[in-house]
């Protein structure tokens, strides 16, 4: 691997030189560079350059908004708007206001401008609540692109247009995109494109090697833990658990963080199984009380598998807290304990509903269901794993479930319930938001209820977009992690309608091929194929 790192350094040096030159000489071309770098999933190499390019473009964009819109192509207005907003630079949506009064002219002028329409459609996904002009622009682009597709079904860009309409960039992880859109960029024949392509290939090789080693370590950790021997009924899915941190911690250097985060994620899944299927209400109450006390005493009445699960939870959490204390000088144990208590209380509430046959009101279900996703537990752990200074003030914000964590959890809960309803996978035992909503609104059809849930998910994404633009105390790296978690949801829950899943499956299969040897590899193959349908 030494040679590949040497080669990476040489190519990286050349690309950085080209990038820095573009920032100074051609700000618009630097936007294409930023866009391509992000699509290729290599932005972790260019954080300073990307920020410098965006700062310069933000100054140009903000100082001459109307002139900029009038004197540039549609794609040259929409692309900087999207890139700036997704990095937290607020840009007024007024730049698209002229579409309201000139829709006929816009249709005539841009009906065949695929690049411009796609750029604008992608930009409208960064809207926040109340930005009607962006909503209108997005709807108009959607119409025009669909019309273009009907006229050009055999065009070499037709597949790309269809993919964009189904899965816009903002909601996807670049790593799992089969993205032909890069070819639309203006510099595709230049030396900088060749360098970027080479750098992306090198990066993919390094990431694949790193991930394979991590899967080996996760697999060994889980086997040595022995929990699967005692808790035989639990879903044995170390690959599925690992996929979340693998997708959200995108920098290859965060190897330790990905492995550490897999551990609490595994417990969220296992404890969820215990509460859903394998524990009586009395046992689950004792189990939850033990978590609240954070001690193993007075648990004699619990079955052995619950006792062992409690012990593993204590050990993993205390070990995690000790590592964070050594690294940051801050002990997060109280925050971690509170996150687990919240989760267990939510699980227990659902167990009470199931035991009594009670179907709660939709708002009550959703408020509890947001917590029972386990998102807060996972994101709290991820917060402490990152490389930034930690203080009591920021910890208090994370501890109190800020909007960005709430939104990610709500998107996951609603997406899970929506996919279950569409595929008829819900077993009806613990209900879903759609069940509760239709029980409240007897005149609503299942299709209308599903459209309502899809609308709620869309609104929550707008709140997430607002959080990107909000100047709060949360580090940008944590914000990006939360966004990646939300982007991972469609891959994990919308598998029947998401072509990106095939890329995810292939990636997991490739990793498992090299990470696990001999007879065990066959088991992992089965697991990696099963995790997407459970």
Swiss-Prot record:
The keyword Lipid metabolism does not apply. GO terms for molecular function: hydrolase activity; magnesium ion binding; terpene synthase activity. Pfam families: Terpene_synth, Terpene_synth_C. Its EC number is 3.1.7.13. One of its GO terms (cellular component) is chloroplast. Mg(2+) 2 binds at residues 272, 276. Keywords: Chloroplast, Hydrolase, Magnesium, Metal-binding, Plant defense, Plastid. Mg(2+) 3 binds at residues 416, 424. This is Neryl diphosphate diphosphatase, chloroplastic. The gene is NES.
């Amino acid at each position: 691997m030494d040679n590949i790192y040497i080669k990476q350094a040489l190519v990286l040096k050349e690309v950085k030189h080209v990038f820095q030159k573009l920032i100074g000489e051609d700000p618009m071309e630097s936007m294409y560079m930023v866009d391509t770098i992000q699509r290729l999933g290599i932005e972790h190499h260019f954080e300073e350059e990307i920020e410098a390019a965006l700062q310069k473009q933000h100054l140009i964009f903000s100082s001459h908004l109307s002139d900029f819109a009038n004197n540039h192509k549609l794609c040259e207005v929409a692309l900087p708007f999207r890139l700036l907003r997704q990095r937290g630079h607020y840009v007024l949506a007024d730049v698209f206001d002229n579409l309201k009064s000139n829709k006929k002219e816009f249709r005539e002028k841009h009906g065949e401008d695929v690049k411009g329409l796609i750029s604008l459609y992608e930009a409208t996904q960064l809207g926040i609540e109340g930005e009607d002009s962006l909503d209108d622009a997005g709807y108009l682009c959607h119409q025009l692109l669909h019309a273009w597709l009907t006229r050009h079904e055999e065009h070499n860009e037709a597949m790309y247009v269809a993919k964009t309409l189904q899965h816009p960039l903002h909601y996807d992880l670049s790593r799992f995109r089969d993205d032909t859109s890069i070819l639309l960029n203006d510099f595709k024949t230049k030396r900088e494109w060749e360098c970027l392509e080479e750098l992306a290939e090198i990066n993919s090789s390094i990431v694949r090697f790193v991930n394979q080693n991590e899967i080996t370590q996760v697999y060994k950790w889980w086997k040595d833990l022995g929990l699967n021997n005692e808790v035989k009924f639990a879903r044995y899915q170390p690959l599925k658990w690992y996929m979340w941190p693998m997708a959200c911690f995108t920098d290859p250097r965060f190897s330790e963080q990905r492995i550490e985060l897999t551990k609490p994620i595994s417990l969220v899944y296992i404890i969820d199984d215990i509460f859903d299927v394998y524990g009586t209400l009395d046992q689950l109450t004792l189990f939850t009380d033990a978590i609240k006390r954070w001690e193993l005493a007075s648990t004699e009445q619990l079955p052995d598998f619950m006792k062992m699960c409690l012990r593993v939870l204590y050990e993993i959490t205390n070990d995690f807290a000790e590592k964070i204390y050594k690294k940051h000088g801050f002990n997060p144990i109280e925050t971690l304990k509170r996150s687990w208590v919240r989760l267990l209380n939510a699980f227990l509430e659902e167990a009470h509903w199931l035991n009594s046959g009670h179907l709660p009101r939709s708002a009550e279900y959703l408020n509890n269901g947001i917590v029972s996703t386990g998102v807060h537990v996972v994101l709290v752990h991820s917060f402490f794993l990152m490389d930034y200074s930690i203080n009591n003030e920021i910890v208090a914000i994370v501890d109190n479930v800020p909007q960005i964590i709430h939104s990610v959890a709500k998107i996951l809960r609603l997406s899970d319930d929506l996919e279950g309803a569409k595929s008829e996978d819900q077993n009806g035992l613990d209900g879903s938001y759609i069940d509760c909503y239709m029980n409240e609104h007897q005149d609503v059809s299942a299709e209308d209820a599903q459209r309502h849930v899809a609308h709620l998910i869309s609104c929550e994404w707008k709140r997430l977009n607002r959080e990107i633009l909000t100047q709060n105390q949360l580090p940008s790296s944590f914000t990006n992690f939360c966004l990646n978690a939300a982007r991972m949801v469609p891959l994990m829950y919308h598998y029947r309608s998401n072509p990106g899943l095939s890329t995810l499956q292939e990636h997991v299969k490739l990793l498992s091929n090299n990470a696990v040897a001999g007879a065990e590899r066959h088991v992992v193959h089965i697991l990696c194929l099963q995790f997407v349908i459970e």
